[in-house]
Regions:
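Motif- and composition-driven signal specific to adenylation
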Residues: 1-156
């Protein structure tokens, strides 16, 4: 704590514009070869401040499950923090369905990004763990409509 106490209490004197580089991610793209993609601050802001596809707010509880090197983590982290929501960090490993379910229940997670396959497995084997989840986002494949209907009927 001594080292922390010696740090400045004011914000760093750094200017970053909307076009400034926020981070670089690597994607395999369509060729399978790693390709660097530069992400500007504007892209993050547009993603998490538009609110056109998801509700952001201080009452939400986001689970940060995606690897930090994956673009979905941008939504999880900044979507929560820039709106005063709570962000629950899952250890950096693949959870079992039971472990994931326990975290969802313990922290009353309301917003969740999962692969379609993982959502389907949770809906089949841990449906009670999804009781507080009001927003499910997925990428890579379409969510299975039957599992979505079942989840929505449990929320009603």
């Amino acid at each position: 704590w001594e080292q922390v106490a010696r740090q400045p209490t004011s914000a760093p004197d750094v200017f970053a514009s909307a076009e400034s580089l926020a981070y670089v991610m690597f994607t395999s793209g369509s060729t399978g070869q790693p390709k660097a993609v530069a992400i500007a601050h504007r892209g993050i802001t547009r993603l998490v401040m538009s609110g056109r596809f998801i509700h952001f707010g201080p009452e939400e509880v986001f689970l940060q499950l995606a690897p930090i090197s994956f673009d979905a983590s941008t939504l999880e982290v900044w979507g929560a923090l820039l709106h005063g929501a709570r962000l629950v960090l899952f250890p950096p490993r693949q959870p079992t369905l039971e472990e994931l379910g326990a975290v969802l229940v313990r922290h009353r997670v309301t917003t969740l990004w999962l692969t379609a396959a993982l959502f389907e497995q949770m809906a089949l084997h841990q449906p009670q763990a999804l009781a507080s989840v009001r927003q499910v986002l997925a990428g890579g494949d379409a969510l299975p409509a039957q599992r979505v209907r079942e989840h929505l009927s449990r929320l009603a």
